[in-house]
Amino acid sequence: MNTYGWDIVYGCSKRVVNKHLKEYITKNNIQFLYSNIDKKQEIKMVFDNWEIINGGSSNFLRIKTPIKEGYFKVRNTTVDLSGINPVLEIKLDFFNDISNPNIKELKFNFGSESNDDIKIIVSDLNGNLQEEDEFYFNKLLINAFIQNEKQISYIFASLNVTSDIEWMNPKQFKFVYYSPTDNSDGYLFILSVVTNRDISKLSANVDGNILGNNSEVGLLISEKLFLQNMVLSRLSSNMGSNINKNNFEVISTSDTTGRIVNNSTLNWYGLKVAALYYYPKINNFSMQLFEGNKLKISLRGLVRLTGLEAVYSDFEIQSINKFVYNSTNKKAYFEVDKNPTSSYKYHLFPGDLISLAVLSSVTHWSIKSIEGALGFELINNFVDLINNTIKWNNLKISQVTNVTLNVGFCIQGNAN
């Protein structure tokens, strides 16, 4: 999955938003009144349930705003608006939460005195409004929205820019609406970067695969953030106490991609062969994503015979470790490669057959030990990750439905 240069992409299904938007409109009995005394014009609208429909783009949502009952007056003429169903495009924007400026709320933004933030797409989807009435209705409708903006305080999403998981905290972000070409449900997306870098040239494209058919929300993390914050901390979990995450670092290959290398010699734990312990060392280690859902690990090292430091073998290993998510126990891991490739070269005194036999055995078990440790499990905090920075429609996600790795790392989930 593609982040298109963004660090983290958050997505929510249109059908989920519509459910909660409907509840909001019903509960709050939304109605607008606007009048212009000088022009002897007035409009009143009591709204039925609003519904987001496909067709929105960038930071505009396309919405059906059916009028349950209402009217507009122009001079001495009154036009009944009951059953009229306007289709509008309304801009969404981020605003600071009143009590906590570190919470950015995604809300309607149609309070501008200009008409740029709200557009009428269809005056009446039901076709009941007379053509000669549309001109006045359209002008009054927009003015009514502008004057009554404070009545609509619905929050589509709350973004926490100072969350407990610091590496996820967005520094810059924007909202986009994604409308699939096959006319299936659209999605609301928030695109974010976690560093202060220029985003003016980043694409507003999104990957619709972030949300599955059975998921309400999705979270897509870039390759580099995944390696830095989810792989690096677990990579050494099977390598013994002498090796930890501080022995590795992520080398950037772009703003959103990278690879893991060692920054110091990796001192493997002691391997007992016969009566003695031997201690392999890895001098060169490289790990990168491969074919989207695998880790390709290449390393070179050596192991010396204890007491005979001049007798040693160089070895190389290449391992392909596939990502697996177990939906039953909710665990994600990189499995051990069943067919890794390896090579080695012995360094010993000519004719020393005893050392050769020992070195052969020590090299074999060193390689097997390292190959078996290159599979590891990720920390199972997927619910925390998907809830950490964002709340869609004030929902808390309690169920992870799927976790995938396909260049980007994706978590999908549902609320209760």
UniProtKB/Swiss-Prot annotation:
Q: Which Pfam families does the UniProt entry name for this protein?
A: Clostridium_P47
The protein's name in its UniProt record = Protein P47
Q: What is known of its domains?
A: An elongated protein with a middle beta-sheet wrapped around a long alpha-helix. Structurally similar to tubular lipid-binding (TULIP) superfamily proteins. The N-terminal domain (residues 35-175) folds very similarly to OrfX2 (residues 6-168), another protein of the same locus. This structure is very similar to OrfX3 in the OrfX1-OrfX3 complex from P.bifermentans (AC A0A5P3XKL3, PDB:8BGM).
Protein family membership: Belongs to the TULIP P47 family.
Q: How does this polypeptide assemble, per the annotation?
A: Part of a crude toxin extract that includes BoNTA2/NTNH, P47, OrfX2 and OrfX3; OrfX1 was not detected.
Which InterPro entries does the UniProt entry name for this protein? Clostridium_P47
Induction summary: The toxin locus has divergently transcribed operons maximally expressed during early stationary phase. This is part of the p47-ntnh-botA operon. The crude toxin extract was isolated from cells that had been growing statically for 96 hours (at protein level).
- Its encoding gene is what? p47
Which species expresses this protein natively?
A: Clostridium botulinum (strain Kyoto / Type A2)
Q: Which UniProt keywords apply?
A: Virulence
Task: State the function annotated in the UniProt record.
Answer: Part of a botulinum neurotoxin type A2 (BoNT) locus; may be part of a progenitor toxin complex required to protect BoNT during its passage through the host gastrointestinal tract.
